[in-house]
C-alpha cells in the first residue's frame, strides 16, 4: 500500500497514468529534476492531500489530477505549478 512517495533526483517525467488509482496515496514529493507531469498521472487518488511540485516543473497535463479532488499543491511562488493550480482551481500553498 503506497501512502507516501518521495522521488530521488534524476526523475524527469511523471508518465501518463503513473499513479492512477492509488487510492491510499496521501503525499507526494517530486524530485527537483522533474520537468513534466503527464495525463492522468495522479487520476483517481482520492486520499492524495499534498503534492510538492518543484520550480523545475514546466508542464502539467490538464488531466494530471483528474478525480483527485482533495489535493493541495505546494510549490514556490511564481512557479508554473502555481499558475496551473490557479487556472484549474486547485488549492495551493507557496513555500
Q: Where in this protein do the model-derived segments appear?
A:
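Structural signature of tandem-repeat unit edges
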Residues: 1-13, 23-36, 45-59, 68-83, ...
Amino acid at each position: 500500500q503506497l501512502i507516501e512517495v518521495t522521488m530521488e533526483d534524476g526523475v524527469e517525467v511523471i508518465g501518463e497514468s503513473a499513479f492512477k488509482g492509488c487510492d491510499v496515496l496521501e503525499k507526494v514529493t517530486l524530485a527537483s529534476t522533474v520537468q513534466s507531469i503527464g495525463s492522468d498521472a495522479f487520476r483517481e487518488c482520492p486520499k492524495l492531500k499534498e503534492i510538492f511540485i518543484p520550480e523545475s516543473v514546466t508542464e502539467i497535463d490538464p488531466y494530471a489530477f483528474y478525480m483527485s479532488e482533495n489535493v493541495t499543491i505546494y510549490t514556490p511562488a511564481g512557479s508554473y505549478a502555481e499558475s496551473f493550480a490557479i487556472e484549474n482551481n486547485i488549492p495551493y500553498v507557496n513555500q
